[in-house]
């Protein structure tokens, strides 16, 4: 990893992210001055600011520091050759603020200023954000979005489970795995015990077969359970609202499952194109889900990790 020092840059700039704006502190390294400005959360405004910096410091490098490693701000600034992006741990800024500005008064230095001070004093210890290739960034985003959707599906599955327990708990016993189309389609077709008890035996068997549930013992156990099941409640004041909620949640759940499948296909394709695919495929326990995540964690710029502890802290 290339080592940087303050002398490499014409200016040090700290950027503090807020909901609708970026608070910016600019420190020309040839002076003791600090300039403050605000840029709106708009791509055009950020581009105008970046180009203004380039004009004011022609043919010179500018060091940018912020508390982010990725996100809209990083994506927007990474394309400018005159900017070198550093990241500082938010905890470090918080500790610095607490140590040197304990009053909490309105005239205390901003986080953007504190970031500049940390950059000026500890540049050699900060990580540089070096953009990955477009292919690696694509894979990284896909893996991240898949992880997010999987968590959404877990949360939604828990809501469905909790709602079914209110009026139709037997359905949870008939299907061990909830993140499946057979479970979703069953609930959509027979959203209550009363409804499924009206179904003919052959109709149920055909349903199971059409969803690749071919084990006779499992299907017969389901049929026996359906036949002998007793309603938890006959109170329409409980059944009707909970059934309506389950139907809404199941519809959302199926959309999520299809979305995850779509991302899986995209991840498989993006991962297949990676040069180091064979290396990560060969790792013990690295299957179709884990191998792409490991590759994203390592990235193509592996020199950015100083030790195994830094790599271990990476979320994939």
Where are these regions (language model features)?
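A detector of single, family-specific signature residues
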Residues: 1-316
């Amino acid at each position: 990893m290339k080592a940087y020092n303050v002398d490499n840059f014409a200016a040090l700039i700290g950027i503090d992210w807020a909901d609708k704006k970026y608070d910016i502190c600019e420190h020309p390294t040839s002076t003791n001055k600090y300039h403050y400005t605000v840029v709106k959360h708009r791509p055009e405004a950020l581009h105008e600011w970046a180009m203004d910096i380039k004009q004011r410091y022609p043919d010179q490098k500018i060091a940018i520091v912020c508390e982010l490693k990725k996100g809209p701000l990083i994506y927007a600034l990474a394309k400018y050759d005159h900017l070198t992006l550093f990241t500082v741990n938010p905890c470090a800024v918080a500790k610095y603020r607490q140590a040197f500005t304990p009053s909490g008064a309105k005239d205390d230095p901003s986080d953007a200023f504190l970031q500049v001070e940390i950059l000026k004093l500890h540049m050699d210890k900060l990580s540089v954000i070096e953009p990955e290739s477009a292919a690696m960034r694509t894979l990284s985003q896909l893996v991240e979005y898949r992880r997010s959707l999987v968590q959404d599906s877990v949360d939604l599955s828990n809501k469905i489970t909790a709602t079914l327990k209110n009026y139709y708990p037997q359905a949870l016993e008939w299907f061990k795995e909830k993140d499946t189309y057979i479970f979703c389609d069953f609930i959509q077709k027979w959203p209550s015990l009363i409804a499924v008890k009206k179904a003919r035996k052959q109709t149920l068997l055909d349903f199971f077969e059409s969803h690749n549930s071919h084990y006779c013992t499992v299907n017969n156990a389901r049929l026996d359970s359906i036949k002998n099941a007793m309603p938890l409640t006959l109170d329409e004041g409980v059944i009707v609202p909970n059934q309506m909620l389950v139907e809404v949640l199941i519809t959302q759940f199926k959309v999520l499952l299809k979305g995850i499948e779509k991302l899986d296909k995209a991840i498989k394709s993006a991962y297949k194109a990676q040069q180091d695919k064979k290396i990560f495929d060969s790792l013990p326990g690295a299957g179709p889900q884990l191998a792409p995540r490991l590759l994203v964690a390592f990235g193509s710029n592996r020199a950015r990790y100083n030790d195994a502890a830094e790599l271990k802290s990476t979320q994939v």
